């Protein structure tokens, strides 16, 4: 990235006593490793530091705006369309044309930035692989740095993995999926890298290191002259999209590549963002390749946004599917918004194959087919799959629905969704609240968190591939039911959720987890630590914004200067 020569030589030459060569004001507090040092070279760190210094005040202001919005919602306000940006929603404009490299996104596979996962996903037959630094990754130092190494090797085409247990070597096929990378959200700090005495912003570290090392090779090998490509999570307002757009423009300028080269799909996975979709696309119009329904996080956000609204309690989370009016309205408006301004839209399937039960596996695949057929008929251009085994079924549905067309951008404009109102998007979901719902939330939340604390962020549980979104839904729903003493339906009829009932549920579900995973795995794992953390979060007087921020404090390891090379 030759244009970084604009910085002074003295700024680049400072050496860290932890072993890394760092620019002025940068301190690496993670373990020293020679492989990591190739990623964390002084020019790459200078690039990340420049992004941090340029945009930190904008990020800080955006987070203050989030806190102010939360205060208003907790006092009784509800999200809605902004009258001040009505002109954007009602005027005619379009996003930049979709690059040929990503015109066809019928099926996308997602997963963490682990070496074997990257190879298998790129070889899976999907059109796109979203490599995840966010909800599918436990962001300890090793995972983050290995992830950057793995992605660099993947872009270079040199990645391989030797599975010693199976004596099998994994390498890339000639034809691979297009690579997208999802950095963390704006709210997540990177506690192993300090810039000017403050933790760096996690997403700027993820984006900055990946872009710095890979933009040139990516454009040659994957992007057909465009890219790199990204997914952007957890945004709540268009001002946050505006920061991303400015980050992209600065990165393009410093790399000496054409403006609009970087492209990103935004996940609409927070309730406030559904009222900002036009505005988000408008801010990113030169860098956008669409929106995606991040529906699990969207349900989490619904509960979090309405945490103080007794009249908006959710039923059991398994009942909050796309058939619920507020979820269907969200999906329909997202499709209309994207196709009006000529860009992509996608969805998600979390099921995984059930290898030891062919009948159950076929039932699961049939559920996937029905879900994907609904998405295709609604106008989605593609969908996510959490496992390679789902790709043929998903691909078949979208190919049959779209024929030879790579997408439905111009054929499924969804003008019928033009009259969707704020009430449609906020309508309370219907269903029952049961003791089994409380049990499932508790059992899944504890098991996911136990895996996360030991370095695994994508966890197969009960035939679904779960990431942090599931644990978040489980936590906030338990918290809300406890706060308001919800009366249970079904077998728990007349029973109210209180701390005594919850304590009994936790004890019984821990016994069940031990039976299911086995005594040895239970003893060696972090189930007890996860149980304490999950229980504390569910019974806290105030609701934390993110479970992962609390859990992150338990996986951060700062290495003393004198031990950094050990």
From Swiss-Prot:
UniProt subcellular location: Glyoxysome
Family to which the UniProt record says this protein belongs: Belongs to the malate synthase family.
Domain of life: Eukaryota
Full protein name: Malate synthase, glyoxysomal
GO BP term, example: glyoxylate cycle
Active-site residues annotated for this sequence: 182, 467
Family annotation (InterPro entries): Malate_synth_C_sf, Malate_synth_sf, Malate_synthA, Malate_synthase_CS, Malate_synthase_TIM, MS_C, MS_N, MS_N_TIM-barrel_dom
Enzyme class: transferase
Catalytic reactions of this protein: glyoxylate + acetyl-CoA + H2O = (S)-malate + CoA + H(+)
E.C. no: 2.3.3.9
UniProt xrefs under NCBIfam families: malate_syn_A
UniProt pathway: Carbohydrate metabolism; glyoxylate cycle; (S)-malate from isocitrate: step 2/2
GO molecular function: malate synthase activity
Motif Microbody targeting signal, residue range(s) on this chain: 564-566
CDD domains xrefs: malate_synt_A (cd00727)
GO cellular component: glyoxysome
Keywords: Glyoxylate bypass, Glyoxysome, Peroxisome, Transferase, Tricarboxylic acid cycle
Gene3D superfamilies per UniProt: Malate synthase, domain 3, Malate synthase, domain III
């Amino acid at each position: 990235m030759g244009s970084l020569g604009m910085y002074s030589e003295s700024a680049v030459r400072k050496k860290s006593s932890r072993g890394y060569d760092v620019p002025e004001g940068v301190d690496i507090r993670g373990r020293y490793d020679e492989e990591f040092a190739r990623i964390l070279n002084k020019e790459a760190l200078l690039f990340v530091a420049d992004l941090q210094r340029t945009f930190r005040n904008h990020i800080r202001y955006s987070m203050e705006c989030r806190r102010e919005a939360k205060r208003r919602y907790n006092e009784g306000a509800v999200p809605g369309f902004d009258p001040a940006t009505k002109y954007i929603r009602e005027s005619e404009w379009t996003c930049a044309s979709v690059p040929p490299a990503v015109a066809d996104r019928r099926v996308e596979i997602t997963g963490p930035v682990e070496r074997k996962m990257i190879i298998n996903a790129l070889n899976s037959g999907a059109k796109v692989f979203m490599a995840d630094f966010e909800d599918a990754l436990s962001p300890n130092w090793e995972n983050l740095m290995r992830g950057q190494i793995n992605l660099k090797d993947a872009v270079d085409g040199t990645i391989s993995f030797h599975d010693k247990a199976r004596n099998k070597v994994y390498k890339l096929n000639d034809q691979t999926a297009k690579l997208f990378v999802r950095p963390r959200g704006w709210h997540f700090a990177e506690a192993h890298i300090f810039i000017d005495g403050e933790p760096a912003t996690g997403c700027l570290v993820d984006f900055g290191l990946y872009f710095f090392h890979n933009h040139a090779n990516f454009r040659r090998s994957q992007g057909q002259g465009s890219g790199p490509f990204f997914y952007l999570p957890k945004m709540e307002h268009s001002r946050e999209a505006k920061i991303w757009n400015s980050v992209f423009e600065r990165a393009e300028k410093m790399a000496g590549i054409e403006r609009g080269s970087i492209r990103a799909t935004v996940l609409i996975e927070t309730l406030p963002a559904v009222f900002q979709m036009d505005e988000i696309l408008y801010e990113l119009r030169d860098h956008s390749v669409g929106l995606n329904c991040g529906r699990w996080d969207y349900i989490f956000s619904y509960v979090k946004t309405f945490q103080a609204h007794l009249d908006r309690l959710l039923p059991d989370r398994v009942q909050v599917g796309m058939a619920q009016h507020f979820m269907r309205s969200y999906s329909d408006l997202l499709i209309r918004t994207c196709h009006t301004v000529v860009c992509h839209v996608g969805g998600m399937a979390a099921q995984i194959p059930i290898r030891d039960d062919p009948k159950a596996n076929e039932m699961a695949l049939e559920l996937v087919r029905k879900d994907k057929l609904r998405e295709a008929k609604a106008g989605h251009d593609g969908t996510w799959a959490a496992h390679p085994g789902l790709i043929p079924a998903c691909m078949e549905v979208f190919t049959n629905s779209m024929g030879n067309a790579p997408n439905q951008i111009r054929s499924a404009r969804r003008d019928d969704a033009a009259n969707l109102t704020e009430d449609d998007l906020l309508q309370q979901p219907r269903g029952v609240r049961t003791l089994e719902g409380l049990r499932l939330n508790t059992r899944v939340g504890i098991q996911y968190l136990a895996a996360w604390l030991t370095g695994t962020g994508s966890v197969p549980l009960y035939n679904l591939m779960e990431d942090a979104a599931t644990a978040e839904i489980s936590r906030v729903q338990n918290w809300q039911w406890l706060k308001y003493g919800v009366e249970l339906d079904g077998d728990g009829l007349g029973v109210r959720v209180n701390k005594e009932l919850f304590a009994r549920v936790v004890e019984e579900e821990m016994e069940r987890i031990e039976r299911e995973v086995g005594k040895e795995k239970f003893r060696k794992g972090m189930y007890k630590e996860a149980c304490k953390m999950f229980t504390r979060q569910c019974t806290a007087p105030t609701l934390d914004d993110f479970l992962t921020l609390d859990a992150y404090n338990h996986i951060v390891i700062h290495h003393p200067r004198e031990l950094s090379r050990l």
